[in-house]
């Protein structure tokens, strides 16, 4: 394994419980981090220890610089994650997946094996095996492309509607 400078392995996870007095108390993080063979961890990457059990980085995982891995997360084998990505607590990332730069994943999700997450995807739902998602909120690639094409046409559609409204108004005035 290779761990580059300024990385933190085993920091406390972000665990706090609200109290009746509107303050928060720290939930003890007493778990650990397991890093398997042939893992590369880039500079300034943080991997939080689990609350009770283990945060697991499986064999062959490659983590770029500036990544946050939350408590209880498991990264599947041979998965690669680009810089400035964050994976919130208790998420399971499938094997042989690719996360582009600045991907954000909310907690407690299950991400499919052999899946791809485009740069800046905001993943808020479970994903299937072999799925490619894009956007924020993240959606399947084909759905995103259709939505994007329509989005680009919106100014023209609005102009057409305004012209039709004028014509209708003129007809009603007669």
Residue map of PLM features:
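Structural signal for interior beta-strand "rungs" in well-ordered beta-sheet cores
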Residues: 1-140
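Long, leucine- and charge-enriched amphipathic alpha-helices
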Residues: 139-174
């Amino acid at each position: 394994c290779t761990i580059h400078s300024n990385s933190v392995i085993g920091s406390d996870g972000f665990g706090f419980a609200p109290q009746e007095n509107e303050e928060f108390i720290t939930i003890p993080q007493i778990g650990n981090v397991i890093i398997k063979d042939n893992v590369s961890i880039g500079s300034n990457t943080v991997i939080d220890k689990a609350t009770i059990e283990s945060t697991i980085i499986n064999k062959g995982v490659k983590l770029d610089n500036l990544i946050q891995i939350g408590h209880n997360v498991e990264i599947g084998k041979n998965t690669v994650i680009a810089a400035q990505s964050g994976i919130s607590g208790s998420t399971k990332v499938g094997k042989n997946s690719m996360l582009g730069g600045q991907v954000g994943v909310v907690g407690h999700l299950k991400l499919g094996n052999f899946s791809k997450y485009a740069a800046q995807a905001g993943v808020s739902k479970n994903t299937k095996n072999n799925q490619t998602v894009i956007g924020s909120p993240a959606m399947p690639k084909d759905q995103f492309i259709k939505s994007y094409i329509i989005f680009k046409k919106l100014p023209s559609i609005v102009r057409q509607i305004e012209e039709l409204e004028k014509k209708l108004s003129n007809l009603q005035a007669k």
